[in-house]
Amino acid sequence: MTKVLIPSSGPNDWKGFLAQPDLHWRTGYSARSLAHCWEAASGLPIEVADIMAGAFGAPMLLFAVPEHKTMLPGGTRESQSDIFALVRHERGLASYTIEGKVEEPFGETVADWSRNASGGKIERLSYLCSMLGLAECAPEVRYQLLHRTVSALIEAERFNASFAGMIVHSFSPACRRFEDFALFVKLLGGGDIQPGQAVVIDTPSGRPLALGWACGDQSFLRA
């Protein structure tokens, strides 16, 4: 894949980067809602900026890349973040992975994903846990949350950023799937978390890691 990027001319440019455009690019679904929300913002959507500010101080978006792929050990399949954002704070650079949601689940639990695991899967899970300072991972945690969060740390290393973060940008009126996210945050030692709140945890790399659940403007569900 080329490393040359070109500016977006609008939300519809995002469609072509989806793994299954005809399936996922639909009104009321996260991919389309997320694209319209971020394109409408002057920089960062306010609900996302608030979480970033709560973690590391006032943020300024440098650039955002839809459907950004991050290589992981233990196989050839990358972690594909809905958005990768490089952000400047007064205290330094931060890399963020953004996971868009409406009603969609976070996918398999670690227990399901690792059942009859190949050597590659065992290697990958061990790597993900080590990056987050976990001796082992609770089987009920969603695997997607693990690799999406570690992707932010990998990109922070690549860009020599001081901080990293993973934010779920949800447009669900009922905050569907929040309980999966809250369980993940607690596993990492972040305690109890509420929507709209930032939690910052320490990581073995020495980079502080922010986690948050941003409640998106539901008008974008109609976009």
Please identify what each model-predicted range represents:
Residues 80-84:
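Conserved beta-strand->loop/alpha-helix structural units within folded catalytic cores of enzymes
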